[in-house]
Amino acid sequence: MADAAPAGDAPPNAGAPAGEGGDGEIVGGPHNPQQIAAQKRLQQTQAQVDEVVDIMRTNVEKVLERDSKLSELDDRADALQQGASQFEQQAGKLKRKFWLQNLKMMIIMGVIGLVVVGIIANKLGLIGGEQPPQYQYPPQYMQPPPPPPQQPAGGQSSLVDAAGAGDGAGAGGSAGAGDHGGV
């Protein structure tokens, strides 16, 4: 610097720390412009180094934080995988259980259906040893009597004549007995 030295023997940088001048300059040595420029570059480089060190510290802290979060995520993923495996096993067991229940229900419904069809078929006479009931005449109508059996000639003609005499058919014998029964 171009300041004049104060009066006395004291150097101009007497209050500065040892090794540096009052303006941050190095004490002892010529103060030419090259040294001043070199010193400024050194200070700028030192500031840049300090800035890079701070950035690196921040980055290292972030990397450590990221690592802890990644390990936590890995633990969660393992727990989730284990839970998914257990869920899959339980779902398989439940599926088999309900499949068996469904199968049992289908078998029961099939047996019930067969029993109902069998009962209906039995009532309709489609199966079983019994014949369906034949048509019966209503009570007000009488079914015609079956024709009397044929009698041999000679031995019992008196009974036939007595039965036939009430009809007014005359004495026709056994030949006329079967002719008037179907009216």
UniProtKB/Swiss-Prot annotation:
Which residue spans traverse the membrane?
A: 107-127
Its membrane topology is listed as: Single-pass type IV membrane protein
Q: Which GO molecular-function terms appear in the entry?
A: SNAP receptor activity; SNARE binding; syntaxin binding
Q: Which UniProt keywords apply?
A: Cytoplasmic vesicle, Endosome, Membrane, Synapse, Transmembrane, Transmembrane helix
Chain's role: Involved in the targeting and/or fusion of transport vesicles to their target membrane. Major SNARE protein of synaptic vesicles which mediates fusion of synaptic vesicles to release neurotransmitters. Essential for fast vesicular exocytosis and activity-dependent neurotransmitter release as well as fast endocytosis that mediates rapid reuse of synaptic vesicles. Also involved in a neuron-specific sort-and-degrade mechanism that promotes endolysosomal degradation and is required for neuronal maintenance.
Q: Quaternary structure?
A: Part of the SNARE core complex containing Snap25 and syntaxin.
What is the protein name for this chain? Neuronal synaptobrevin
Q: What is the originating organism of this protein?
A: Drosophila melanogaster
